């Protein structure tokens, strides 16, 4: 598994995300692909060509002072009450509200449970395999925004992600 701070956990023999284990796995992959006559980069391009060029990013908004926590909660409440129908070039298809354990299809109004533990997280499923997610930090006076898209090339995915991130910031 991976985490935002780029930790890597392979297997169940260690509980800490460890750079040594990650480097060992990377070296093992490089050695394997060398026997296949390709580099790690070649294989990465093979994966992109097969599955698409996915790209993700994040940004944060800081809310300092005594009223910071209230402003963050107000922002989360506003997203829940006034779910955007469109974010930039992308139509919002579904909203996953983990705090209220509900997935809402915005076209039909149908709902289903998330089936996951409750958490103050909103995940917006967008058309064309794009998405964004918003949540307050558990340790800092910040709201974190995550986004991801699928493009047809490295350049296309970078351009689409930049446009989506800008649309989220201006929403």
Language model features with spans:
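Phosphate-binding and adjacent anionic-ligand microenvironments
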Residues: 1-135, 142-146, 153-158, 165-171
């Amino acid at each position: 598994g991976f985490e935002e701070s780029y930790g890597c956990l392979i297997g169940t023999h260690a509980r800490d995300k460890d750079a040594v284990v990650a480097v060992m796995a990377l070296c093992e992959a490089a050695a394997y692909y060398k026997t296949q006559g390709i580099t790690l980069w070649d294989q990465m391009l093979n994966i992109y060509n097969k599955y698409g060029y996915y790209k993700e990013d994040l940004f944060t908004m800081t809310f300092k002072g005594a009223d910071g926590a209230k402003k963050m909660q107000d922002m989360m409440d506003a997203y829940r009450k006034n779910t955007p129908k469109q974010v930039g070039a992308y139509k919002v298809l579904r909203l996953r509200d983990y705090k209220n354990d509900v997935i809402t299809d915005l076209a039909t109004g149908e709902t289903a449970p998330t089936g996951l533990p409750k958490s103050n997280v909103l995940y917006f499923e967008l058309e064309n395999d794009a998405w964004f997610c918003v949540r307050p930090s558990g340790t800092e006076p910040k709201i974190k925004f995550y986004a991801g898209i699928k493009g047809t090339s490295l350049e296309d995915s970078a351009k689409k992600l930049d446009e989506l991130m800008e649309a989220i910031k201006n929403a």
